């Protein structure tokens, strides 16, 4: 039975399997996961195109405070692992010795299942030797405030904007969710290798300058080969992002389909989400050496063999999203 004890903001409960090594780095800003076993990224039956997606069990369960979320990312800049991927290309893999990519994943505070990464590889099978896959879990503080959203057309025409229309474009979320779902506004066909531009006619304002709205993909979309380029919603600009179809066939999106999620963060690390709109990097990596935000309170990654007891109770438990999307 799970404990009902609330976690302190700076404590993350961690259970790690023998197949992975987990250790805190960069002054505790992230938990680095390195494979102790050979990871086989095998193409599943029915996979098509040059790239195929694989759901990789990263061997950990984590539990953080409800005011936080965890971002799963591929790590670069560590001396003991291969070089990080360059910008995505269907032809070359500049700088990517391992020939695999990892999509950003959001682990909600309520998720208690094993964290899984959506990864992409080329060829028939890609084998990653022990010690050559480096992933990271980055703790991200969520904003306690919402943002005020107005229609850009009303603002530009000098008319008084309506009251906050946030929920006209973003679905309500549960307390244990990190993000607000974003639905497609129209039907669309995304051609192979096409980056489809999504723009919502809205701008935001906030009384708290630390609030940083960011847009992330959804694991279910990643598994389909539709990658939302993770980006921040830049102040003064419309809400916009790109969806890349890495398949060798067109993919159809229907109006109302959930395609992305908005996460309201506070002072998110620019090494994780740069300050500008992301136009060309569907699979960014996180470099702890490039981090510019420093947590005033050190993060304690509390390792345990009694996870179900030490982790606070959760309405979601092992179901739903948690970098699985299934």
From Swiss-Prot:
Its EC number is 3.6.1.23. Transmembrane segments: none annotated. SUPFAM superfamilies: dUTPase-like (SSF51283). Gene3D superfamilies: 2.70.40.10. Belongs to the dUTPase family. Involved in nucleotide metabolism: produces dUMP, the immediate precursor of thymidine nucleotides and decreases the intracellular concentration of dUTP to avoid uracil incorporation into viral DNA. This is Deoxyuridine 5'-triphosphate nucleotidohydrolase.
């Amino acid at each position: 039975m799970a404990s009902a004890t609330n976690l302190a903001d700076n404590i993350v409960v961690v259970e790690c399997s023998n197949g992975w090594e987990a250790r805190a780095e960069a002054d505790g800003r992230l938990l680095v996961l390195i494979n102790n076993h050979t990871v086989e990224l095998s193409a599943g039956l029915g996979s098509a195109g040059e790239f195929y997606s694989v759901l990789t069990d990263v061997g950990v369960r984590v539990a953080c405070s409800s005011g936080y979320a965890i971002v799963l990312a591929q790590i670069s800049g560590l001396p003991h692992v291969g070089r990080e991927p360059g910008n995505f290309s269907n032809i070359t893999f500049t700088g990517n010795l391992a020939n695999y990519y990892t999509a950003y994943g959001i682990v909600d505070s309520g998720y208690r299942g094993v964290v899984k990464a959506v990864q992409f590889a080329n060829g028939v099978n890609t084998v990653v030797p022990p010690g050559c896959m480096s992933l990271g879990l980055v703790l991200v503080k969520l904003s306690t405030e919402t943002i005020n959203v107005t229609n850009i057309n009303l603002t530009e025409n000098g008319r008084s904007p309506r009251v906050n229309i946030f929920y006209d474009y973003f679905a309500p979320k549960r307390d244990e969710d990190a993000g607000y779902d974003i639905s497609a506004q129209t039907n669309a066909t995304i051609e192979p290798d096409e980056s489809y531009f999504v723009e919502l006619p809205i701008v935001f304002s906030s009384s708290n300058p630390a609030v940083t709205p960011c847009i992330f993909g959804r694991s279910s979309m990643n598994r389909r080969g539709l990658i939302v380029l993770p980006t921040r919603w830049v102040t003064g600009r419309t809400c916009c992002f790109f969806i890349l179809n890495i398949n060798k066939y067109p993919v159809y999106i229907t109006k109302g389909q959930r395609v992305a999620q908005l996460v309201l963060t506070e002072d998110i690390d620019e090494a994780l989400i740069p300050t500008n709109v992301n136009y060309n990097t569907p699979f960014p990596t996180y470099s702890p050496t490039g981090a510019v935000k420093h947590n005033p309170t050190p993060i304690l990654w509390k390792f345990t063999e009694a996870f179900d007891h030490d982790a606070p109770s959760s309405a979601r438990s092992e179901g739903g999203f948690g970098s699985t999307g299934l």
